[in-house]
């Protein structure tokens, strides 16, 4: 493929040009098939070209493609909101739509500032919230996401996130919470802090589930100070961790929840969920967007939710996640370069002691195993597993076999 007219700003982890995809597989223009465990960076939740999603999009395109919500409402907006209300944790019952994770995260911050009349936001080390100017300022997983764009917006403060590699996790959680407390004493007073925004499982930061004591400690502090708790479920939501949202593992109800990626099986769509009384504090007309709540995206999201509503769907996510982690742990016994295996559902991270080894394994898996994997983490030492959630037992076995071969070949 000639790329002479494409921007050079995109970074690619493979040189592949894809002609089609089905389920967990993609086929290149050269006719080669690859097992896709990148899934559009955890986006293709129901796999490539799921027939129900494809039909929903095609059927909607025959009715109308775009109906701008500031001009008139279309007939899928409310049905989707009702479905999301049924799925969302706690009393979340009101929804705003956008196109991407970064947009919806920025919307969450705007709502939090208007609702609380406070100017500041707290994020955490290792976080990723997007690539707009505001969300870059909120992103701390890698300098490459921020470099060359200063000055970034002010009013963003970074608190420590517990390291999963610390030997004593109780001590590590206490250290991180003390760091948060210190931040509220030294840099952003509680009455100036609108919100805390947290990924329940760090995404780009290395697929690190938040320790329960840490996330509960944060929520307790937020409640005590009137600080809104925003759950960034852009990557961890819609079944990725084995529950519809990762906060369900912790029994938590966020004030605001950010949804994107897997919500529409690959169609650009995002949603913000909150309680009606919070949403009512958002000044009418102070936020919006041309394509937010677009009819095609709503159709894709409704079809995705229908697929995920089958109890067998999440049961498969949990079973395949257990199979995947068990297989990696078995290989860990033979290869001490793997320092940790962690994750929830099909959001699994494999930590290595050497970033160069991770890159070599990715390369071998792609070229010899026809398996697409991506890395994560500040130092690039985490190999992340994020297959489509429809992956089956045989496909997990194929991926593990390719990974095992790569471990041996790169030793």
Where do the language-model regions lie?
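Conserved N-terminal phosphate-binding loop of PLP-dependent enzymes in the Aspartate aminotransferase
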Residues: 1-411
